[in-house]
Amino acid sequence: MGAVLKIPPPFSLILTCGKDVTMGKYVLKRLVYIVIVFFIISFLMYALYNLIPTDPARAQLEPMRPQLKPDEYFRMYEQLRKEMGLDDHLVIRYARWMGIIKGLKGEFDGLLQGNFGYSQTFKKPVVQQITEPMKNTIFINIFATIAALGITLPLGVYCAVHKGKKFDTTVQTMSILGYSLPIFIISLIFMYFFVVRWGIFPLMGSKTPNASYEPGSWAEFVDKLYHIALPVIVMTFASLGGMTRYVRSSMIEALGTDYIRTARAKGLREKVVIYSHAWRNALLPIITSILAWFLGIFGGSVIIENTFSLNGMGKLYWTGLNTLDFELVLAIQMFYTAVSLIGSLLIDLSYGIVDPRVRVDK
């Protein structure tokens, strides 16, 4: 028998600490990259929106124009542009908007300090305006994500195990159909049956008009859940095709590997082979889509929210674009940029957790 090398406790502790240090260095390096990329994207977005011919000072004074004389209007207009710093260089305005340099009031009051700007459309700070739509978007997407994952993961695994059977063929046909149809077509079909024909769900809105509930009450929760049920069903159905096919293909690839054939040759039970061996190895490519779905909880769907008149982030973003409210649009864009950058780091780290063969530091 060969001698077994045993690592003394102090040395094993050093190796463990070394692994933790390597992980810490990797995370620190990625965080530095995230900060650099965030500043680059923020500057490009700010410069892009400033190329669009809009004038916040003119938009703010326009309602007062009929009551003002031309010379008085022009004088107020020039003064307001100076107060808003619109005549300064693009780089200066960007640095002021980000909070890198002091603002016009002599204070650091930008994006880095939590000041997301002022919405000219809604006449309130952007932070106050996005609070309610963000709550609605998260509320809807949590249910849609849980429902979609709860269906697609077991369905994809079952279709892979029973590849070529009638059930698998039927699911693949329906998946292609659902994947090919635009989501607004799916919305209209579901609205016709569930609202017009059967009258099960309300047509639009996120709560009953003129209904008075105490904030956070059970009645408010049930009413909101009733109103978002149809949008959640539409979002779930629209996402079934792509994710089911992705899970199925990953499982089929895993089931065709040599170690699965070896496990079956050893006489292991089929459930052990599928769920303990094949599923764990098939999970690595799937985890990207799963985490992307969870990160998408914060992102609103422009089409769904406009179709069903839901007060969410997607509809708010669309309103900001239509009304040229670029401080609102930029704030939403920067939030999604930060979520995407942090999400990419979480996806990379999750690879090392799911598959120990992956070297995170590489």
Regions found by a protein language model. Give the residues of each.
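Residue-level signal for discrete positions within transmembrane alpha-helices
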Residues: I34, P133, T137, T173-S180, ...
